[in-house]
């Protein structure tokens, strides 16, 4: 049980509590407050009898030599009302203190329960998410490296194709040049053929002319022989006659030599030109065959490279599609995980804000409790001081 006692000075004083009321005592008089015994929370409060004491000294520090008038019945009604008011206010204070203590206890229990439910608690295990994310990153990195290798291979294949294309264009230009040379040689061959035909025709003409000359010569010889055989030899002294047979023989010999020489020269020139042309044609034909073989090989190589390039491009497109699909799928998963993390962070922020608000409310309630305890201590000091004052007055009266 807790005991409270009031002590009131002779000067006028007033104080208020949470109930909003006030107590006032007039100067020149004092009363002896009874002992107040109250249980926990203001229950079982009992008040003893009170008596009013009048003093002419009017202060605490003055002597007690003045006359003291006492009366148990004086202002008895006022004392009862005052004490009843004090008892009611004290009971109200104690009831409020008890209610605040209960509310404080309830809040502490709620805060403890909330911390147990919403507090840090057992942390959620995201290790399997981390492992999955790490595996996905490794897969993406591997796919990126593989894609880079494929791109490098494609670039190498493109460079090789460009090189082969350049070689092909060079060989094609060489082939066209060789074909142009062959066409030129063909024109030369045609010209040589025409020249050969012309020479053959000239030879035939010369042969015909030679045959005609032979025939004409034979006819003339026959005529001359007939004329010589039928003539009478007459010897006259004259200049020696011209030997026509010898002249004709010499002319025939000269013509035959000239014709044979022309024939041999023409035949030798024709043979030399034909052999040279055949050699050139053979050389160009061999070179043309080699060029055709190289062109065929290059064309076959180019077709193989084009097929390989198409396959590499198809593989690249497939890998790019797979990479895009993988990035989209794992991007969606990462977005879901990020949304989950954002939701958890929002919940954590709400929990922190709620905790801060409850801490502020708790601090506010603690401040109210502290002020109430200070007021109760003030009442206690007032009661104890009033009791000591009345005890001093009682001792002075006894003396």
Curated annotation (Swiss-Prot):
Region Coil 1A, annotated ranges: 79-114
Domain IF rod: 79-390
Keywords: Coiled coil, Intermediate filament, Keratin, Methylation, Phosphoprotein
Residue span of region Linker 1: 115-132
Note: There are two types of cytoskeletal and microfibrillar keratin: I (acidic; 40-55 kDa) and II (neutral to basic; 56-70 kDa).
UniProt subunit comment: Heterotetramer of two type I and two type II keratins. Interacts with PNN and the actin-binding domain of DMD.
UniProt name for this protein: Keratin, type I cytoskeletal 19
Phylogenetic classification of the source organism: Eukaryota, Metazoa, Chordata, Craniata, Vertebrata
């Amino acid at each position: 049980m807790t005991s409270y006692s009031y002590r009131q000075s002779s000067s006028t004083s007033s104080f208020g509590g949470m109930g909003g009321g006030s107590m006032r005592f007039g100067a020149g008089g004092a009363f002896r407050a009874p002992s107040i015994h109250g249980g926990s929370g203001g229950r079982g409060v009992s008040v003893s009898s009170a008596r009013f004491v009048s003093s002419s000294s009017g202060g605490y520090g003055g002597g007690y030599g003045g006359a003291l008038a006492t009366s148990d019945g004086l202002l008895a009604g006022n004392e009862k009302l005052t004490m009843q008011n004090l008892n009611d206010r004290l009971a109200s204070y104690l009831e409020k203190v008890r209610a605040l203590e209960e509310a404080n206890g309830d809040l502490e229990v709620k805060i403890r329960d909330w911390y147990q439910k919403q507090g840090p608690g057992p942390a959620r295990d995201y290790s399997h998410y981390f492992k999955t994310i790490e595996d996905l990153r490794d897969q993406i990195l591997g796919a990126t490296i593989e894609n880079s290798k494929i791109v490098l291979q494609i670039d190498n294949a493109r460079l090789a194709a460009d090189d082969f294309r350049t070689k092909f264009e060079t060989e094609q230009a060489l082939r066209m040049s060789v074909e142009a040379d062959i066409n030129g040689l063909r024109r030369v061959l045609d010209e040589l053929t025409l020249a050969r035909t012309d020479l053959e025709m000239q030879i035939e003409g010369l042969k015909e002319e030679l045959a005609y000359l032979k025939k004409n010569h034979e006819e003339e010889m026959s005529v001359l022989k007939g004329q010589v055989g039928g003539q009478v030899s007459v010897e006259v002294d004259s200049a020696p006659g011209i030997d026509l047979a010898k002249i004709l023989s010499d002319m025939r010999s000269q013509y035959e030599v000239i014709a044979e020489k022309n024939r041999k020269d023409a035949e030798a020139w024709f043979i030399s030109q034909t052999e040279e042309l055949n050699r050139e044609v053979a050389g160009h034909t061999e070179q043309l065959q080699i060029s055709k073989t190289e062109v065929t090989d290059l064309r076959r190589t180019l077709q193989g490279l084009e097929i390989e390039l198409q396959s590499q491009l198809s593989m690249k497109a497939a890998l790019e599609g797979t990479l895009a699909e993988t990035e989209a799928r794992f991007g969606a998963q990462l977005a879901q995980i990020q949304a989950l993390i954002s939701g958890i962070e929002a919940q954590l922020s709400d929990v922190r804000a709620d905790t801060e608000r409850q801490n502020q409310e708790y601090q506010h309630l603690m401040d109210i409790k502290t002020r109430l305890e200070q007021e109760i201590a003030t009442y206690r000091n007032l009661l104890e001081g009033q009791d000591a004052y009345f005890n001093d007055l009682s001792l002075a009266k006894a003396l």
